[in-house]
Each structure stands twice: as C-alpha cells, then as structure tokens.
From Swiss-Prot:
Task of the protein: Involved in the regulation of actin cytoskeleton.
Residue stretches of biased makeup (Basic and acidic residues): 93-110, 242-256, 284-296, 312-383, 412-423, 506-524, 597-606, 642-653, 769-778
Main location: cytoplasm
Organism from which the protein derives: Saccharomyces cerevisiae (strain ATCC 204508 / S288c) (Baker's yeast)
Biological process annotations from GO: actin cytoskeleton organization; cytoskeleton organization; negative regulation of Arp2/3 complex-mediated actin nucleation
Region (Disordered): 68-116, 135-156, 231-256, 284-888
Name of the protein in its database record: Myosin tail region-interacting protein MTI1
Top-level lineage group: Eukaryota
Biased composition (Acidic residues): 398-411, 544-558
Sites bearing Phosphoserine, chain numbering: 103, 158, 166, 565, 621, 631, 634, 638, 647, 889
Ranges of Low complexity composition bias in the record: 574-585
Biased amino acid composition, Polar residues: 77-89, 138-149, 607-641, 654-668, 832-853
Length: 1157
C-alpha cells in the first residue's frame, strides 16, 4: 500500500508510551499530523496537547491508521445515503406531480406494477441497499412527462424499467422462506453437495446406490428413500458458530469426560497390570527352578556324610583342591536357601492384592541384587568358583563382577542354578554316587547340609579374615590346558588385591594409626592445623593469645573462661608489679613436674602475670592440643582434668601471694627512711616497660583491687612507730604538715610529724600516699632532685597521672563498676589538692591505665571546681588534650564501624581551651576525623547581684544518628573560673522508628526531590554535589547531609557478597526520591562483543557517589537514577547483579523531628 503524500493525518489505534526522548507518546484516538516518513516502520509527526503545546517525535506505524482511508470510506458511503434520501423523498414527488400530466395509459401501466411502499415506513440501512440507479431514472422520466415533453428517453412500458422497479419496490424486511421438507425424486433431481469441507465434520447426504442388479431392487430402494425425509443442507457458518450440532458433536458428548488425573490413574493401572503379568511369568519360571533345585538337594542329602568322610581322607594327598572343596559349596547353598525363602514368601503372598505384588517384586529384585553382591564378594577370596565355571558356558560372565550386580533377569539366575546342579551331579560319581559325566573336567565338592545360619556366620567370619586369606590360600590350577589363567577375571582381581594388600596390612594394628588416618583426624576441624603451628612456635603464645582463644575455646570452654576471669582479676596487680617484687615467681618452679607441656604452662602463666596483655588462654591451648591427639593416655590425663585445675589453683595462690607481697613492699617503700634511693631504683626497670599495654586495659580491671582495701585498716597504726626514722631524711615536711592531717582525718589520727605514712594503707590504689608525696615534693626546698626521684612513683600507684588536670564534671559518663567508686570514696579530699600539682608530674605520667584513674576522676567530679589551680596550668591543659589516645586507637582499629567510634566518643574538657568560647568543634571529636553535624544553643539566665549566666549546649549528630550533648554553664563575666560541664549520649532512633513514619516523610519530601531533579536534567552545574544542593533547599525542615554520604534514615544496605535474595523486602520499600550512595564500587558491564567493561563508582572517599532514585526496576533488577556526570545532570541506571565490590546504601530524607531536633 502506497503512503499518502505528507503531510497527512493519522489516528492512534492504541496508546503508545516510550522512555526514549525522541519518541512521541500519545493516547488512543489521538489525531497526529505526519510530517515525514522515517522508514517502512516509523513516522515522524506532531500534535497539540491540551495545554496548546506542540509535541513532536517518531512513532511506529502499527499504532496508528491513516485518516484518509476512513475519509474514503465515508465518501463511498455518502452516495448511498444520498440515494436513500432521494428515494425517501421521491414517492412524495410522484404522488403530487404525476396525476395531472400523466395519460391514462401511463397511469394504468404504473398501477399495474407493484405498489411502492413509502420510505418513511420502511427503514432501509445504507449498507444493505445497493445504489438505486433505476429510481433516479424513473424520477427523470416523470419530470419529463410533467414538463410536457413528449420525448422520453426510456419508455415506461419497457421490460427493463419494470424489472428495475420491481427489484427495489419489494419489502426487504420480509425474509426469504426456507425450503420446506419435501419428497425429492432422486432419479430426476440430482443431489448437490453444498459443503466443500472435511467430510467427517459436515453432513454429506447418502449417495445413490450403484450396486442394484435389477430395476426392481432400484425401485424398491427408491420407495424406501421416498419415505425418508432428506434433511436440509447445512451451512458451514452455522456449524462453526455452534448453532447446529453435527454427528461428531453428538459423539463427543456421548463420550465420558475424563480429567488429567483420571487419565494418569488409568495409565498407571495399565502399567500395574502389565507389571503383574510380567511378575506372573517370573513366578512361573522361579517355581520351575525351585522344583529342580529341590530335587537336586534331596538327591544329594543321603550322600553328605560319606562325602564328607571321603573328602577328609582325600584332602591330604591333594592339597591343591582343599580350598575348592571347602568354599565351592557356599555360594551354591546360599543361593538355594535364598530361593527357598523367596518361594515360601511368594506362596504366602499369592493372595495379596496387586499393590502388595508390586512391593514384593521390588523386594525380590533387591534380594537378588544382595545375593549377587555377596556371591561377587566371596568370589574375590575364593578361587574354586572360577574353575567350576571355566569349561561350561563361562562366556556370559567374562566381564567384570559389576555386571552381575546390574543383571536382574531371572533367566540368568536360572542358568546359574542349572550349572550348579550339573556340577553337583557330575561330582557325585567320585564319592560313591551313580557315575555321571563331569563336563568341567575337574573335581567339584559336594555341599553340606542346606542350613542357612551356619553358612552366614562363616561368611561373616571369612569377610573379616579375607585380607589374610587372600595371601595364604594357594591358587587353584586350571585342569583344562587350553585355559589361560590370566584371562580369568577372578584371577586378575585377586592379583590386584594382592598388590594393594601390603598397604592395607599396615593398618591392622589397632593401636597404631596411619598417616592418612591422622590427616583425616586433623582434618575434622581447621583449628587443629592452627594448634600445630602454635606448638611449633610456643614463644608466640602470649602475642597470639586471641587466636588461641578461638582455636581451643570449643575444647574446654569452662576452664578457659575460669582462667581468663582469674587473670583479669589479677591484671591490675600485674600492672603494679615491678622487678623488685619477684618473690611470687619462685612459687612456679615448685609445682610437680607433670610433663614438658605443664612446665610451659607455668611459664606462660608467669609471663601473663608480668605482661600487661595478660591473656591466660595460651595456658589451655597446649593442653587441648595434646588431648586432641589421643595417642598417649597418660599425658592427656596429666594435662587435662585434675592436674590442670591444680595448676590453676596454684596460679591463683601465686596471684594472691603476689598481691600480699606487693602491699608489703609498698609499705616498706613508703615507711623506710631512705625512701628516695628506693624509688630511684624502682624507676629504672619501669622505664624499660613498653607503654603499649596502656590502651588494652580500660574497663574492668579496677574491680579486683577491691579485696586489697580491707587490708588497709591494720596498717595505719604502724606509722607512729616508724615516725622516728622517717622524719630525719625529710626536714622540709613540717611546714606543709598542716594540710595532710586534715585530709587523712577520716582514716588516720592527726599526726603532724609523719605525713608520708597515711598514704600507705591502700596498696593497690595508693592514691593518698602519692598525693601527699606530691605535696611534699612541691613544698620542699630541693624541688628538682626530689621530683626526679619520685617521678616513677606512678608505677606503684598508677591512678594519679590523669587525676591532676581533670576538672570536676568531665568524666561523667565513664562506664566503670560501682565497686571501684565505693572503695575509692574516702579519698576525695586529697584530689582537691592534687589539682595543684606541678606540670612536670603530669607530663611524666601519661602512661598510666585509664581504667584505674577513672575511679579517681569519678571522685573529683563530685567536688566544686578549684579555681586557683586552673590559672597555673596552661601546660597541663595541653597535655590533657593530648590524652585521648584511647579513643584514637579505637578509631584506628575500627575504621569502618562508625557506630562503635561514635558511641565511644568522650570530650575531656579543659577550661583553658577556647573552643567552647569560640563555638567550634572540640579537638576530642575533630581529631577523630568523624563526620558529624554540630548545632549550638545558648540560653541566658539572669541572677541576682547583676550576674548573667550562660547555658551553652553543643549537639553533635553522628552518621548513625546517635547524639552527644555537651552542656556548659558559666558566668559570662568570668567563664574560665565558673564553668561546669555535663555530657549526655543519646542512641540512634532508627530502630525505634516505624515504617509508617518513613512513609510519611516520603510523601512530604520525596516528590519535591524528584520534581527538582527532573527540572535539572541536561543542565550543567559543574563539580557541585547534586544531591546536597537539592536537600539544602529544605534546610529548615530536614536534617542536612552528614559528610556528603549520609542523607537520612537507611532503607537499604548492600554488599555484593551478601546476595540479592535477602534484600527483597528492603528493595520493596524503595520509593522515587530516595538517595542512592555508592562507595568504592566496581560494576562489570556485560557486552555482547568484546571484553566486559569495568566501571568504578564512588572511588573518592571524601565525597562518595550520590544520586536521586527515580525507580527500581524489579524485572531488570536495577536502579534508575538522576546523577551528576562530569558536571552534567543525566539519567542513568545501575544493576545490582553487575556490582562486584564496594558498598551501596539507599537513604530517605527525614525531618528534624526524627532525632528530636
């Protein structure tokens, strides 16, 4: 069909929508003006929408129809309508105009014709009435007659005109009468076949018989046919529409209706009947075989005793046939017994139904397989069966023994039984039986009694001794000279078994294990390989204690936990120990020398008591390794069980002796006269201790120090006795003696001349003693030398280093046990004065564990701020701001866990720092390189005496939406002197928020985000963050992005190794307007030709990739997004299945009320 010339109109037959920008989308019945024809399948056109905008694009031809064709149809139909109108109007013209000019002859001719029916009463459809050309002709004739013209183009009496008029004047509503049932003369009227179609589907009238030999018979048949009524011809359209039923339809209705299940059941029934018939044949064959076998057994029974006697006599001169006579009868008799059992079971089950027969048939085949397997196993260790079957039809079994297992045909079993029977009959003549021909050419043993149980027992015993018998039994020599022994499959397999036998005989000793078994034993768990490595390098047991914990925790969890908890209790004592306290180490060599490994255990315990790492799990690791091997029972008993518990108890006693020794040595150091030299000696070994253990002991160690506190009360009465020797070496002490008695008043009576004595009682903490020592150092005349001598004192009293610079309310949220606070409660007064310590003391004491001094800090926060001491500590504030390595180390070890880092953030306040006055981020948070939002609220309070106080709240919102609030209260005139602090932490609200709230946020903000994103498509914005720019427009309503990578509540978090199946619920929650963030991801784009392309997305860690989600296509499993690509806003898509590495998250913008702001 040729296309019309452009431009032309087309009408949409179907709605068309496409995602491509060049395509023209339209709805059904839309009129489109085609401006150009692109090719054989596409048009290019345009139309005006409801807003008056002209939209243009390409669209397929199959969706539209050319409007010109419809116009042509209307043009064709318009003459029809005009003719009908002319025809309806024309009768009125004839009635009015014809009576006067028409002559009587003409009137008679017109009246004699058929009377026309008025058009008003006859509705004539335009589609069914042909073009009435005769009507126009008659109207022209009447017009000529009325005009008076005697000339007529067409005479009225012409038959041609009458025929035309009669055709259009008849009533078209009258139906053509159907042919009535009439008697047809078959001789004169031929039968016409009205249907040219498939014969079986449509009716075909019977043909005229041509077999008539005479006219009488033909007339007779005609009379019979006259009585029959010939049915009316059938229209094919009526048959197909279903209005008339044929004979085939009647036959189909008469057939029974069956469902698919019924057909399957019928098919199964047929299969079952077929199986039953086959079973019947097998049963008949088996009965015949059993009858032959019974007759053979009954014939051989009378001769069994004589045969056995003769057999025993003939075994000595012919030893080569001994295994033959011993083992030849086993498979034969077992097969006979099996067939007897199957026969009895079959006879018992003859009355069962068909289903039981099928089950029985399956059992029968399984039993045959078992019998054949047992025969094949026996044949490997017995060479007699070979020679009995070499000469007679052994061609069927020259294959492997595996073929015997697979054969289930009863015919093969029957042949085997027949061969066995013939072998028995042939051997009977040699032992007194009737003489018969032996077709095998060799002697064959006669079976014993056909009892089944003894044979089975012997068979089991021989299976166990089979490896030894294969070596000891002599090989049978074939009798026939033409038989090659190497061609026998049994002989070949016996050789193979002999070749493999030496490797198997090595493992017969139950106490010895092969290397393969040891490998399997170690292969049962991967931890044993690690254990072996640790045994090879025992010197790394302390450093690799964490790995040992994982390796051997499943071995003895209770012992490991008990040791670990005990070492943790002694952990703080081990930190306070120094080389001058070595008396406890001599206890370990006194343990009974159980083994070399127990000595290593004790050595490990000593190292763990001295090291700050202090992990005791290496103690149990060598024990569990020895116990796992299980080869030496004595060693396992000595290491595991009671001896191991004994070593633990001894170690516990050692720890207690070390703690008591520590308290005694501390008292001796504090109360001895030459105190300075002793402390200087202690300082040297402490300097050698590496500072790395400090961060590893933060939380629970202060608890074990509680038991040592009760031992403090008996010590205070001792100082008066030792006051005389202690006073001479310290002359400048009396001037400062006024302060110490007041401080130690709760526990010690006021003794002015002996200030150093009161601090001695609490040995593990030793806080009062060291505080007073610091005061003595500050007030004494030779300040520098004394500070150097007392510098290492924190080794015996570690809680001091951080206490001096700490303000009262800084460590309010330290997670410390309550027991530590209760035991350290009596010492708050010394801490108030400790804040006045010198900066040199503080700078030299930063290695002390934070867990112990947290208790002192708890005490200090209960006191009001000591203002005078703050002005003299600019250096202390600097050192204190640097004392946050604990949090920094957590950041380094858990870089990817933002939640854990933010939960451990703690601001250590120093009033001399200016960040809280300048309203900037504190160094404790900014140094961690955490992403957060900070907002500050100031509240002014007016008080009496014209004072104006300020309550300043710092709110820090981290990426997991957990918060830290740091509140400061100070006088606006003197903030540094009057400031007090309080910090609180609030968890993330994500878990508590419901999906309903997130859906509300999606309705509020997502539509705006999508609308704004679509408006920016194809625009150039440069290197700006596209998503942050959009979110910033709702600054007063929503939470702003954190670090350009957290944009709200997390809807989806995905890593390629996790799989997509688990994300279906999360993917269903994604809505247009959500934010997609991708970090360090690699997508593998598949191409039809060439190599796959690797695309890197979000490799910039400072500013990861972010875009606006417009849709998630579940059919293609990909995100459709709007993104910033090299400064231009475009549309793109990313498939999750193409993502090979990295991390992907989907966020939803939330309101400020989501976090309580």
């Amino acid at each position: 069909m040729s296309e019309p010339e452009v431009p032309f109109k087309v009408v949409a037959q179907f709605p068309y929508k496409s995602d491509y920008e060049d395509d023209l989308n339209f709805e059904k019945d839309q009129e489109i003006i085609v401006t150009s024809v692109e090719d054989a399948e596409w048009y290019f056109g345009e139309y005006q929408d409801s807003n008056g905008d002209v939209i243009e694009g390409i669209f397929p031809k199959s969706f539209v129809a050319v409007q010109g064709s419809e116009v042509g149809k209307e043009a064709e139909s318009s003459p029809n309508t005009g003719s009908t109108e002319q025809r309806t109007i024309q009768p009125e013209v004839e009635q009015k105009d014809l009576p006067e000019p028409i002559s009587p002859e003409t009137k008679k001719e017109t009246l004699s014709g058929p009377v026309p029916v008025p058009a008003a009463t006859v509705p004539v459809p335009a589609a069914t009435v042909p073009v009435p050309a005769a009507t126009a002709v008659s109207a022209q004739v009447q017009h000529d007659s009325s005009s008076g013209n005697g000339e007529r183009k067409v005479p009225m009496d012409s038959p041609k005109l009458k025929a035309r008029l009669s055709m259009f004047n008849q009533d078209i509503t009258e139906q053509v009468p159907l042919p009535k049932s009439t008697h047809l003369d078959l001789e004169n009227i031929p039968v016409k076949k009205t249907i040219v179609a498939d014969a079986p589907k449509y009716y075909v009238p019977p043909g005229i018989p041509t077999n008539d030999t005479s006219n009488l018979e033909r007339k007779k048949s005609l009379k019979e046919n006259e009585k029959k009524i010939v049915p009316e011809p059938i229209n094919r359209a009526q048959v197909e529409s279903g209005r008339i039923e044929t004979e085939n339809d009647q036959l189909k209705k008469d057939l029974p209706q069956m469902s698919l299940k019924e057909r399957i059941a019928l098919l199964q029934e047929q299969q079952r009947l077929q199986a039953a018939r086959e079973e019947e044949l097998l049963r008949k064959k088996a009965k015949l075989e059993q009858e032959h076998e019974r007759s053979a057994v009954n014939k051989n029974e009378p001769y069994t005793e004589t045969e056995e006697a003769e057999e025993n006599e003939k075994t000595e001169p012919k030893p080569e046939f001994t295994p033959e006579t011993e083992h030849n009868e086993e498979p034969q008799m077992e097969l006979l017994a099996h067939k007897e059992i199957t026969k009895t079971s079959r006879e018992a089950d003859e009355g069962t139904n068909d289903i039981e027969k099928e089950q029985f048939l399956d059992e029968y085949t399984k039993e045959n397989q078992k019998v054949e397997e047992s025969q094949a196993d026996e044949a490997r260790g017995e060479n007699v069966a070979e020679e009995s079957e070499i000469g007679y039809g052994h061609e069927d079994r020259e294959g492997d023994n595996d073929e015997e297992k697979e054969e289930e045909d009863s015919e093969e079993n029957r042949r085997a039984a027949l061969r066995e029977r013939m072998a028995k009959l042939s051997g009977a003549s040699r032992f007194g039986a009737p003489v018969g021909f032996n077709p095998f050419g060799m002697a064959s043993g006669v079976g014993n009694k056909p009892s089944e149980e003894p044979k089975k027992k012997q068979h089991k015993e021989k299976e166990e001794e089979e490896p030894e018998q294969l070596q000891e039994l002599p090989r049978a020599i074939p009798v026939m000279p033409f038989v090659d022994p190497s061609s026998n499959p049994f002989f070949r397999k016996s050789n193979l078994s002999e070749k493999n036998q030496p490797t198997e005989t090595k493992t017969l000793d139950p106490h010895a294990t092969t290397e393969h078994e040891q490998k399997q034993e170690h292969g049962t768990h991967a931890y044993h390989n690690l254990a072996a490595v640790d045994n090879a390098h025992p010197e790394y047991s302390d450093h690799d204690s964490d790995e040992d914990t994982d390796d051997h925790e499943f071995e003895d969890a209770n012992d490991g936990l008990r040791k670990h908890s005990m070492v943790e209790q002694a952990f703080q004592i081990g930190n306070n120990e120094s080389e001058n306290v070595n008396s406890g180490e001599k206890i370990y060599p006194q343990e009974p020398p159980i083994s070399h490994r127990t000595a290593e255990v004790s050595h490990d315990i000593e190292n763990s008591s001295q090291n700050t790492t202090g992990n005791v799990l290496p103690v149990s690791s060598p024990q569990t390794r020895v116990a796992r091997n299980g080869s030496i029972n004595s060693l396992t008993k000595s290491i595991s069980g009671e001896n191991r518990r004994k070593s633990i108890n001894e170690y516990h006693d050692t720890v207690s002796t070390n703690s008591s020794a520590l308290t005694e040595t501390a008292q001796d150091i504090s109360m001895a006269a030459p105190a300075a030299p002793v402390l200087s000696k202690v300082s040297h070994p402490e300097d050698k201790v590496p500072p790395h253990p400090v961060p590893s002991a933060p939380s629970a160690p202060p608890v074990p120090s509680a038991p040592s506190v009760p031992s403090a009360p008996p010590v205070p009465p001792a100082p008066p006795a030792l006051s005389a020797p202690s006073v001479p070496p310290v002359p400048p002490v009396p001037p400062v003696s006024s302060a110490p008695p007041a401080l130690s008043a709760p526990s010690i009576p006021p003794v002015p001349p002996t200030p150093p004595a009161p601090p001695a009682p609490p040995a593990p903490l030793a806080l009062p003693k060291h505080n007073e020592v610091e005061e003595h150092v500050k007030s004494s005349a030779p300040l520098p030398p004394v500070s150097e001598e007392y510098h290492p004192m924190p080794n015996t009293a570690p809680p001091l280093p951080r206490a001096p610079p700490v303000p009262p309310a800084t460590f309010e949220f330290d997670s410390e046990p309550t027991a530590t606070h209760s035991h350290t409660a009596p010492s708050p007064p010394p801490h108030q004065n400790v804040t006045a310590s010198t900066p040199s003391m503080m700078s030299t004491q930063q290695r002390v564990p934070t867990s112990v001094l947290s208790g002192a800090e708890k005490e200090s926060r209960t006191l009001p701020p000591h203002v005078p001491s703050l002005t003299n500590r600019p250096v202390d504030s600097f050192h204190e701001s640097d004392t946050t390595p604990k949090v920094a180390s957590i950041r380094r070890s858990t870089t990817h866990d933002v939640g854990e880092i933010s939960n451990n953030v703690k601001i250590e306040f120093n009033a001399q720092e200016r960040w809280w006055i300048n309203k900037s981020a504190p160094p404790a948070i900014s140094n961690l390189k955490l992403n957060f939002l900070m907002e500050i609220d100031d509240h002014f309070i007016s008080k009496r005496l014209h004072q104006k106080w300020v309550v300043r709240d710092f709110y820090f919102l981290f990426e997991n939406y957990s918060q830290l609030r740091f509140s400061l209260t100070f006088n606006s005139t003197s903030p540094e002197k009057t400031v007090t602090t309080l910090q609180e932490r609030f968890p993330s609200p994500v878990e508590t928020q419901s999906a309903r709230i997130l859906d509300e946020y999606a309705q509020r903000f997502n539509a705006k985000v999508v609308e704004k994103s679509h408006s920016l498509i194809n625009s150039h914005i440069g290197a700006k963050n596209f998503v942050s720019q959009i979110v910033s427009e709702f600054k007063d309503e929503v939470i702003q992005p954190i670090g350009a990578r957290t944009f709200g509540a997390t809807i989806l978090s995905y890593k390629p190794e996790e799989g997509i199946e688990q994300l279906m619920k999360s993917l269903q929650k994604i809505k247009p307007g959500d934010i997609l963030v991708i970090r360090k991801a690699k997508f593998e784009a598949h191409k039809k030709i060439g190599k796959n392309e690797i695309i890197n997305v979000g490799m910039d860690s400072a500013a990861p990739y972010s875009s606006v989600v417009t849709d998630y296509d579940f059919t293609k499993n990909k995100f459709r997004v709007i993104e910033n690509h090299e400064g231009k806003i475009i549309q793109n898509s990313y498939k999750l299945s193409h993502m090979k590495s990295g991390k992907l998250k989907v966020f939803r913008i939330v309101a400020r009320g989501y976090v309580g702001w």
